[in-house]
């Protein structure tokens, strides 16, 4: 009985396995079958770049070069604008620069019976003068009433120049204080320089001058005593034991 049961069970299992295999195969479609039009297209997955870091570096480098180029162009544009402005300032004639001065000359402080004559020279400083000339007498006036010609010059004051720097004297005979001794030395030594330009020759010369000065000081004459009462003889000190 057991053997029959096992055989039947094996047959059932084989049948079930065959049925399941045939059902799965039936659902499969052939490879060359045409796809339906309404089916959604699968998304294209872009492959990941292995050298992504190098690509990013190249992009950054390109952007940097682009910004540097723009900055250079801006600088050149600004510089050209500045140069154009400088040229325009330089090319302004003196007649335009001295408009206010001319107006002041012709309107302010003009005496009666005189007219203002404004003159200027076309140069960098635009020097100008304001003269006053007497007007001609009217036709009905007498000849005796002639007015003397009067000219008044107003000169533009000169610009104050900065004082020149005094140069150090670097040649000729100099008196230099060296080791509390005034020594005259001829040579290229700047005044007040005590150590930098002293070489062996000058040091020897200084030593020789010092020795000569010391000898003269020793062999000099003694000063005469001042007139006055002579001091008396000093009294001898008494011994301490005499009191006892």
Curated annotation (Swiss-Prot):
Sequence repeat locations: 29-34, 35-40, 41-47, 156-159, 161-164, 165-168, 225-228, 229-232, 233-236, 237-240
Keyword Heme recorded: no
Region of interest called 3 X 4 AA approximate tandem repeats of K-P-P-K, as start-end residue ranges on this chain: 156-168
Tissue specificity annotation: Salivary gland.
Stretches for region Disordered: 23-91, 137-169, 206-244
Localization terms from the record: Secreted
Bias-annotated ranges (Basic and acidic residues): 26-86, 157-169, 235-244
Signal sequence range: 1-21
Biased composition range(s): Basic residues: 209-224
The entry's keywords: Repeat, Secreted, Signal
Nuclease in keyword set: no
Residue numbers spanned by region 4 X 4 AA approximate tandem repeats of P-K-[PQ]-[GA]: 225-240
Stretches for region 3 X 6 AA approximate tandem repeats of K-P-K-D-A-P: 29-47
GO CC terms, sorted: extracellular region
Function according to Swiss-Prot or TrEMBL: Used by the larvae to construct a supramolecular structure, the larval tube.
Protein's UniProt name: Salivary gland SP38-40.A protein
Record gene name: SP38-40.A
